Amino acid sequence: MFTASKLKVMQLRSYDLFLDLDFQNLQFRGRVLIELESERDVTLNSIGLRILNSRSDGKTLDFEQSGEDLLIKTGPFKGTVEVEYAGSIPDLLVGIYRAPYDGTYMVTTQFEAAHARRMLPCVDHPDYKAEFKLTLKIDKDLDAISNMPIESVEVEDDKKVVSFQKTLRMSTYLLYLGIGRFEEAKERLGDIEVIFATSTGKAGKGQFALEAAKRSLEFYQSYFGISYMLPKVHLITVPEFAAGAMENWGAITFREAALEVDENSGFKTRRRVAEVVAHELAHQWFGNLVTMKWWNDLWLNESFATFMGYKVVDTAYPEWSVWQEFLITEASGAMARDSLKNTHPIEVDIKSPDEIEQIFDEISYGKGACILRMIEAY
């Protein structure tokens, strides 16, 4: 498994990804063209994928797989590497996976921290950003969501080819793909389309989340002095989801309970939904547009979004007095976690992706947010 120091020999420009997805049998075949420059043989990350071939300019390239590394024998290289491969869609809740509900399922992705390699061979490292061009071949009765709006749809018998607009330069962990049958509710904030996407029959539960998202976007655009960079943002409910939410750029995913509000939902539910929406939208600037070089700085990524989420909700809903909740939830939670023998500093020296999952906790989120609030008030 390679680390940041070994990756400095490579520069990435773009991924052009095509996936032919068998929704019924939960299989897919992929082809990715990666434009890059490398001082030596190209090393990519890949796990659970069956590599069929690799080539460049029509010439077959030898390759070796070892653990999660895919070594393509290019020598010093500048150009486009093409890799064809096949994979399956498990129930792992990371990478590309199946999320069941009501006798059916959706296919969704969760790539943070280092799971994009489960859907495509890539340099799965936050500092190695690239543009992504995604094209899918799926059943024609299915819907598809990704980071960018759909560019074109071409029907081929019982299938359709869906092409999405090219993304901005971004890290692999922010790429998103969702396939299934979605129902949507939409609002607009200027040129930005804000979309609540959920399983059929639940679109009415997204109105409060849409309102909270619009208020958050207005706040951040003013606070940062930088407009939201994409033409749309999806808020997507996922029925089986290990995280509370995930800030995929332009296609944010949530647990259903973290996003849905109806007439029976109380004040605490609405407050929690507003906080989570504001947190994930903060990442669209801090984390997505501006990104840490390595996971040592996860605390700043997450604590800043936590801190900003409270600022937004306090501005949008001042009657809720959320800074009192901050003391109860974030400060007290961090102190309790910090009292344990296995606590850790807010900045942790991460040697490999295997260690990253261990620090998504009250220290990285809550303690870091408390320190940022202290700094602001200093």
Predicted segments, located by residue:
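Hydrophobic alpha-helical and helix-loop surface patches within well-folded domains
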Residues: F164, F196-Y378
